[in-house]
Amino acid sequence: MKELSSAQIRQMYLDFFKSKGHDVMKSAPLIPHDDPTLLWINSGVATMKKYFDGSVVPKNHRITSSQKSIRTNDIENVGHTARHHTLFEMLGNFSVGDYFKKEAITWAWELLTSPEWFDMDKEKLYITVYPEDKDAKKYWEEVGVDPSHIYEAEDNFWDIGEGPSGPDSEIFFDRGQEMNNLPEDDPESYPGGENERYLEIWNIVFSEFNHKPDGTYEPLPHKNIDTGMGLERVVSVFQHARTNFETDLFLPIIEKTAELSAGKKYGENAEADVSFKVIADHARAVTFAIGDGALPSNEGRGYVIRRLIRRAVMHGQKLGIDEAFLYKLVPVVGKIMESAYPEVLEQAEFIEKVIKMEEDRFNDTLKDGMQLLDSLIAETKENGGKELPGKPVFKLYDTYGFPLELTKEYANDEGLDVDEEGFNEEMEQQKARARAARSDAKSMGVQNGLLTDITTSSEYVGYHELKANGVLKDIIIDNELVDTVPADSRAQVIFDKTPFYAEMGGQVADKGVIKNQAGEVVAEVEDVQHAPNGQNMHTIHALKEMTRENTYSLEVDVAFHNKVKKNHTATHLLDQALRDVLGSHTHQAGSLVEPTYLRFDFTNLGSVTAEDLKKIEDIVNAKIWENIQVETVVTDKESAEKMGAIALFGDKYGDTVRVVKVGDYSMEFCGGTHVANTNEIGLFKIVSESGVGAGVRRIEAVTSEEAFEFLEERNQLLRQSADELKIVQIKEVPRKIEQLQEQVKLLEQQKQALEDKFASQQAGDIFKNIKDINGKTLIAGQVNVSGMSQLRQLADQWKEKQLSDVLVLATATADGKVNLITAISSDAVKEGYKAGDLIKAIAPKVGGGGGGRPDLAQAGGKKPEGIQEALKAAEDWLNK
């Protein structure tokens, strides 16, 4: 067997299948495009759904790829096993209704064993087949597999719900007994068993059945091949590595982490090795995910990124790394993957910035979590408990990123255990919720042979004309091909020629009417979508009967169409203006182009400031008023990229592409409709900017008449405001508002002064009430103040006057909450008394928790009725 690097293995796989007539498909971004059922691209086949369910017919029915993927259902196993990863690459070859079992098996064996390719030892390869799949077994024997190396397995049937399914064959590599974790005679020591000797390296799925909604199976109209070879696994075979982590995909990251650690080295300590592996795995995942547009947040993909970063940071602390470090691993990841993913190094600066910001932010979160943990420990001890309950411990893990091991360590220091069973129950409930949310995500959709088989030629002419004659070629009603559309019915129809734009790239479909040769309106066009083979398929409401092979006049609603194209060109200008103002890291995350407004989603770390929004708006309007010609160029993809055309992030393009150029300012791949000159847009106005998800912002804007109407509405609102403020000139409105704000500010200051005076009067009474408890003086009482800031002022007065050894003050706020503050004199602190310990002892009485310094601590609570009990608890604490 050859000595190959991961880059060589990846390239050799793709080159082999390219030699067999496959198109090499570039890895799609990790964020699914137009597939709301998936959180992440989680397999090679995930990008093939549209082909396998027949909704789109590929240009080449043979495809191969190395697809980056993320799976997060087993995060806790990462670092503890040899092959669990969050990010991985799946090598795959796919046949969409083309070759089937014989070719798939023959080529798999050739790639694995041919000296020209992988050159694996045939004697070390084992195959599993589905017992009823006699053809697969026959073909494996025909290519030369020893029958004793072929195993039948009942679970060799790939089925994930509705859609394509079928038997599969798994290929195992015998790494030798020295790699095994079991005795040679163990019942699990066989290909397919739970052992480390026989490593699964490839799975070939023969999709030949449709799993129907009623649970039955029927033969697929078009049989498919779907294979998956985990790159990390096969690299470990070629590089004779015991685990995936001892390969060139991970070792450089581990070595860099060791450099950053407090003298730790990989391979010296099992516990430290877990941390090294976790960090290496998570560094890869967050680097690629952020590069593909996912940003840390508290929901969806962003939550996954945040959790991975926090878990890596906590493991860094176990290695003695106390400062932000994960971001320093990004260039290492980029260098390892450079041959296949050069964009990682190109984006490295931005990715590093995002990770470092999140690492720094986690330090603050860590403090909040520690306060909650301290409160939980104090409350448990107060109630005589022996272990921390599982539910709040899981909250620490889930919300604050506290690993269970860390919580256990702190609990043990306080003489407590942790309810791990309760914790695991909470974990399982969360996983169940996640599985339920993903239940539909795996289904590929039942293959529709009818639409897939329609190959009628249909020409779109709407770029140049909005009225055209077309012959009605296909009529579909209730999923059946028919010859006539009855009056007052709905149908899907295809013409040999159409001016109607089909919804694509965020642009809505054209609307309009269809007329017969007598000029009568026979149908209204309600929607237009692309059929699997690319034809424009019109959804119509027929007013009169329509018949196949008759010629009709197709007429687009010109006013509707013109409004849409103005907004589409404005979207291109907005896209470029965003990059000009915010930076090159910003890219499109979605768009909607309607006749009345446009919506544009884009990646950005935070909200766009009002100042930047104005800059963006000014740039777009400047380009509109420059009267720039808009041109379209149809060329090959490579030439378009050399021209500098920007491709929509995540979109797939054929060999021939259409490029829309707005002078020298904007140049994008686009199949939409556009104005001939920017002056047709007239005016551009941003109406809102908001967040829609993890690191994704949304701008909504209007153009032309809608922009004028928007400004007119705002002018009316200003006029009404001026009337309410009793001023004549609209321009005086801001000044009048400033005056009112100053008056409000003055009144608030006066109110605060009165509250401070009242608080001091109360304090004077409380400060006189000094108790002697166990040799220490205590002042404890409830005051009627507005909140924590005034409690701190009273504590400062107490400190200046040195009135007692210990101070405890409480107040009930207007919203039904409690604020507590404790203070210890400097002499008492020297004797070992700590305000933080005192606050932890009394805060549970008001249903809260807190912490602080030895001389000053504070807490919040939600039980005002417990204030007197908390004050009494302070006396008990001193008595101890």
UniProtKB/Swiss-Prot annotation:
Consists of three domains; the N-terminal catalytic domain, the editing domain and the C-terminal C-Ala domain. The editing domain removes incorrectly charged amino acids, while the C-Ala domain, along with tRNA(Ala), serves as a bridge to cooperatively bring together the editing and aminoacylation centers thus stimulating deacylation of misacylated tRNAs. GO terms for cellular component: cytosol. SUPFAM superfamilies: Class II aaRS and biotin synthetases, Putative anticodon-binding domain of alanyl-tRNA synthetase (AlaRS), ThrRS/AlaRS common domain, Translation proteins. CDD domains: AlaRS_core (cd00673). Its EC number is 6.1.1.7. It is an enzyme of class 6 (ligase). This is Alanine--tRNA ligase. Belongs to the class-II aminoacyl-tRNA synthetase family. Catalyzes the attachment of alanine to tRNA(Ala) in a two-step reaction: alanine is first activated by ATP to form Ala-AMP and then transferred to the acceptor end of tRNA(Ala). Also edits incorrectly charged Ser-tRNA(Ala) and Gly-tRNA(Ala) via its editing domain. One of its GO terms (molecular function) is aminoacyl-tRNA deacylase activity. PANTHER family: ALANINE--TRNA LIGASE, CYTOPLASMIC, ALANYL-TRNA SYNTHETASE. Binds 1 zinc ion per subunit. It is found in: Cytoplasm. Disulfide bonds: none annotated. Keywords: Aminoacyl-tRNA synthetase, ATP-binding, Cytoplasm, Ligase, Metal-binding, Nucleotide-binding, Protein biosynthesis, RNA-binding, tRNA-binding, Zinc. Its main location: cytoplasm. Pfam families: DHHA1 (PF02272), tRNA-synt_2c (PF01411), tRNA_SAD (PF07973). Zn(2+) binds at H568, H572, C670, H674. SMART domains: tRNA_SAD.
